[in-house]
Design a protein with these regions (language model features):
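Short catalytic-site patches enriched in acidic/histidine residues
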Residues: 70-87, 110, 151-157, 216-219
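Short, conserved beta-strand element in jelly-roll/cupin
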Residues: 72, 102-107, 155, 195-196
Length: 294
């Protein structure tokens, strides 16, 4: 296996290879990892993510996996890097981490078999599919603002080639405390299946990335929290939560705190209980209403 990273060095983008605690450029320059300014390890034209894949996640929501994977799209502007700041806007409070393994496409592919999918994968990285659930009442179907806001797709620190994804652990930590833990053997659809499935109808280009799903226990984070995702053989992706500007109030849907929002953010069973997005005319907060009656 080898690990390739992209860093900013002397105001230029450099592709470097990792050797222990050092990163080495093609012309022989060396940089300590701790001093490197990391960029995302690839330059995708598409960021695609699966909704559900781990058995623990479906059990947490008291739901069942669909018969086949379902996906959503994250804008390129959501892309972030190792040690990058993840922004939670003012007036928002339900920003969740979701530690994941990321597939990086190496060659253009379309309409390929599962057996051939590995030929089109450049390697693997670590991702954190952050979700701003304050907008779930508005964009639950498309996930556009829930998962697509700027900075909500950290990937890194590097791209590892020839990594065997079978029976590997994945863990997420917040401020050093373990929050998520699972194993790739508990994924319903493996990496090769996901690539072949998407490529049936969508051309995948070099650098494109696919988030492969998160296990149970995705939870909200607070300003100042440090979130780390660790994957066996891939390393550790680190990000800090910072506060952004306030969401404009004179235009568009506003952050909400409905029971669906809170239940999703806290790993609840809103779908099992038949709760649906509240009226788009009122966007009532059933959580607030319930608290007012207590």
């Amino acid at each position: 296996m080898s690990e390739i990273r992209r860093i900013l060095l002397d105001d230029k983008v450099e592709v470097v290879e990792r050797f222990g605690d050092l990163l080495k450029t093609e012309d022989g320059r060396k940089v300590l990892i701790e001093n490197a300014v990391h960029l995302p390890p690839c330059e995708p034209t598409k960021i695609i993510a699966i909704h559900l894949n781990y058995d623990s996640r479906t059990k947490e929501f008291l739901t069942k996996l669909p018969l086949a994977p379902t996906y959503f799209h994250k804008p390129i502007t959501a892309l972030n890097s190792h040690n990058g700041d993840v922004v939670r806007p003012k007036r928002c409070k339900w920003l969740n981490y979701e530690g994941e393994i990321v597939i990086v496409i190496g060659k253009t592919c379309k309409d390929i078999s599962i057996a051939d999918a590995h030929k089109y994968i450049a390697g693997y990285s670590i991702g954190n599919d952050f979700g701003l659930h304050d907008f779930r009442d508005t964009d639950a179907g498309s996930m556009l603002r829930v998962k697509g806001a700027d900075s909500l797709a950290p990937v890194g620190p590097g791209l590892v080639t020839d990594w065997d994804f079978h029976n590997k652990f994945i863990r997420t930590y917040v401020n050093g405390v373990l929050k998520q833990e699972d194993n790739t053997k508990n994924m319903e659809w493996d990496m090769h299946y996901l690539v072949a499935d998407i490529a049936r109808t969508i051309t995948l280009s070099p650098g494109d990335i696919i988030f492969s799903g998160t296990p149970a226990n995705s939870r909200p984070v607070n300003i100042g929290d440090v979130v780390e995702v660790e994957v066996e053989g891939l390393g550790r992706l680190t990000n800090r939560i910072v506060e952004g500007h306030s969401i404009r109030e004179e235009v568009g849907a506003q952050p909400t705190e409905s029971e669906e929002v809170v239940s999703t953010a806290l790993g609840g069973d809103w779908e099992f209980r038949g709760i649906r997005t509240p009226s788009k005319d009122l966007y009532p907060s059933t959580v607030k209403e319930r608290n007012d009656h207590n």
